[in-house]
Amino acid sequence: MKPSFDIKILHTTDVHGCFFPFDFIERKPCSGSMARVSSYVKRLRKKYGRRLLLVDGGDVLQGQPACYYSNYVDPSLPNVAAEVLNYMRYDVQTIGNHDIETGRAVYDKYVGEVHCEVLAANVVDTATLRPRFKPYAIREVHGTRIAFIGMLTPTIPYWLHETLWQGMTFLDIVATTRKWVAHVRQTEQADVVVGLFHSGFEGGIAGNTGNENAALETARSVVGIDFILCGHDHRLRKATVSAGGKHIDVVNPSSNAHYLSESTLHMARDAHGRSRLTSIDTQLVCIDNEPVDADFMRRFAPTITQVRRYADREIGSLARTLRTRDCFFGPAPFNSLIHDIQLDYTKADISLNAPLKFDVCIPKGPVRVSDLFNLYTYENQLYVLRMTGQEIRSLLELSYDQWIATMRSPRDHIMLMQQTPDGQWHWRNLAFNFDTAAGIDYEVNVARPHGSRINILRLSSGRPFSDEAHYRVAMNSYRGNGGGELLTRGAGIPLAEIPSRIESISPEDQRTIIMAYIERLHTIPATTHHNWRFVPESLALPALARDRRLLFPPS
């Protein structure tokens, strides 16, 4: 064997069903996709052969109609995600939170069909405390033992109902990584230890089972880990952490198969023939300009045809165009439609909803199944929770506090946003937590600070609104389980108390509910419910116009 050699590790994450170079939602060709990743992988395999490993960081089962079709419309066939990973010969994968969200029947079937090992060391059986998935995988490459330790973000109970993860307990990433690094170093005699995390760099929810995004914290505090491949937060980023006399790379290739991370392990052998890692070079590789793998496309041509036929089916029509961008500046048809559907289905008193995408447009005219993935991105269910008037008010206070600034002069920004080095403006916080309410009439005072902005005037029916009264409130399951912390940090409801507040859960996912509503009415007027506004308008209206031009520059 050579005294020095290189090993390549290619890493994808958060693919979200972007398997093919066609966007079934927008009904047009797209960049990225696993079809292009496949070309890149094949080219490097010709050079490196068995010295190349291909791994994935999870969230592969949700996002595009191809996933939905395979998961729920025709689950009798092997899952398309498993078929894609098997075709590309993936070596290891860590499971993601959106994989868990598909439901036990889907993800258990997937784990049984995919040929690579599926990891999550910090997900244990509640009764036995033994790992629910494999904690790690060992790959021997050119005489080198490489250990991959899988970690899943532990804050799943904040987003998903317990029926989706019943019998599982989620442990702190840092402590669990420390345990398994010691194990693979001592028991498995691993030469290289890699963290394969479905967890982002830092930030997010700080739960009672650890931080949502813990890659940097782990790199700083766990001795014996060589580098970390992370994901979940969709942030394209590479960082190097100095800890314990070592430099540890942490890399995230973002989402939707536009990038992958490529790590080159420079290895040497000691006098006894034992492999030793001398250095690592890590880079982010954009694959948007890679050629599409023709053999990949031939293999999956029948699947593509089936999914296009499903996604192109017309289910109704819109009387006007819907744009998510309008939702950030006041009442808008997009949010009003979702509120209408939620109130119609649940007969609740009040509805909460936020736009799930920054800027999508569904034009007036025919509505197809594919449009529903723009209307509603994920397979959330629809919940009804019992809340007091004061809790609703406090929830809205936190929602708008993440969304708007306190204006002190007419020249101030109204939107809570920041400018990037390239001059573009973006939200400072996650827009899918910008909840508005229907069923109540209220004002948002932009001149007042958090805690005193929301003035609820009445129920939209004309009846009085009371802080002490209890109301039935409709919301998606992400919010209803504590996602975005609007129920916990905002409304002040302890996480452990939330299940007792849930009055009903829809058996269908929200996209199915929306489809049934549109098919029933056929023509959707998409009117705007002007039940709330920013005040004082002398401050708010000019600022809204200015900030809208910054966030969405005229073309």
Which residues make up each language-model segment?
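Acidic, metal/ion-coordinating pockets
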Residues: 1-290, 329-341, 351, 504-506
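Catalytic centers of hydrolytic enzymes
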Residues: 2-8, 12-27, 31-46, 159-174, ...
